[in-house]
């Protein structure tokens, strides 16, 4: 499965959530609402989830192994950094 598109849909400087991303695989399947979060150890991605109880969330879609998680995280964080640069240039 190949990542064919990564789109930053919402970018913000406020709070821990930095952006929301959609990622397309093989030009056939898209996963929306992947979040980039600023944590204690730096940026990480949070997969789309739904609330399943008081304060509990469950991923709707997620990678099955660490290798795919790393591929996703690398692609999403690269798109985030590129969007951030474009946003800063546009603000000047």
UniProtKB/Swiss-Prot annotation:
Keyword list, A-Z? Cell cycle, Cell division, Septation
Q: Does the keyword Cell division apply?
A: yes
One Pfam family it belongs to = SpoVG
GO biological process terms, alphabetically, are:
division septum assembly; sporulation resulting in formation of a cellular spore
Q: Does the keyword Cell division apply?
A: yes
Superkingdom of origin organism: Bacteria
SUPFAM superfamilies per record: SpoVG-like (SSF160537)
What does the record give as the function of this protein? Could be involved in septation.
Give the family from UniProt. Answer: Belongs to the SpoVG family.
Identify the HAMAP family for this entry: SpoVG
Name of the featured protein? Putative septation protein SpoVG
Tell me which species this is from.
Clostridioides difficile (strain 630) (Peptoclostridium difficile)
